[in-house]
Amino acid sequence: MVMQHATKYVSVDAIPNKRAISIEWPENIIGEFEKNIYIGTNEKNMKPLICIDILLSENQANGALNFIVRSDAFESHYTYKVIDGNVSIDNVSTPLCINIGRSTLSLSEFLCKDRYFPTVRFVDGTTLQGQYMAEYRNEDVLFDREKIQVWDWVGVNIKNESQGNEKDNTSIQYCVIKKLKEQNFDIIFDDDNAGEIADVIAIKVDDVNKKVKVELFHLKFSQEDRPGARINDLYAVNGQAQKCVSWLHTKPEHILGRMLKRGASGPKNRYELGTQEQLSIIREKVKSLYEVEYIVNIV
């Protein structure tokens, strides 16, 4: 019975010919180590990892995975290949370097190291790290229809996802934040842009039961003017939601600490409700053994 849900690892000779839905940083640089990691076009133009995105390119080809590493200051394109069991990650445009502690090397070289292969997730639930494919022997579980909520989108431009610095009141994100403000949250945080865990993070503290609820909201704009059951939109937003799971395996105070750093940097005020001081207090409560519950929402 234990082996029924075991994970099987298979060495592959080439990139599998199936749809990839997300790419993630290696798990062992998330959390504790990320605060000491910087990426940039040169040693004088470095950004912390919390401000860097890694994502699949819209243009894919058989036998390779094209992906992008970007921040608000640069965008770099890479190609990930497996040829006869050997991994290559090559820069296509705008080469980047990575700084860890006192060590600096090219991002291509770093990502080809055994411990630092990116994680690629495929639509069938398998993952690829380096030349190893992980197959999870879990039974498919149907999503509970009762958990699907229907919202009123009148007045919202469903092709416009982000509210931006100007807080566009016709955007999907603005609408979501407005609805969350009607609920009993202590913190509502705009985490949008490169390096995000989610588009919106909402936090509620229960001091009586010593619990902290953290809700992550992943948003996806519609590719067309009218709503529809478009599988491409579903793949995209589910890929985003799966990426944040790696964060949920780190210590909760790492997520809150990361929010504090992002909230204190840049011109954008990310606190839609609550303050940096309140978030700092919540982080201390989490460190003092408050139980944390995570809920992932797709909008």
Label the model's feature ranges.
Residues 292-299:
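Hydrophobic beta-strand segments of well-ordered beta-sheets in folded domains
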Residues 1, 179-248, 253-255, 259-285:
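Catalytic centers of nucleases
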Residues 1-163:
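Long, charge-dense tracts
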Residues 285-291:
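Short, basic/hydrophobic alpha-helical segments
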Residues 147-195:
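Catalytic-core elements of nucleic-acid end-processing and repair enzymes
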Residues 4, 60, 129-131, 149, ...:
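Residue-identity detector for glutamine
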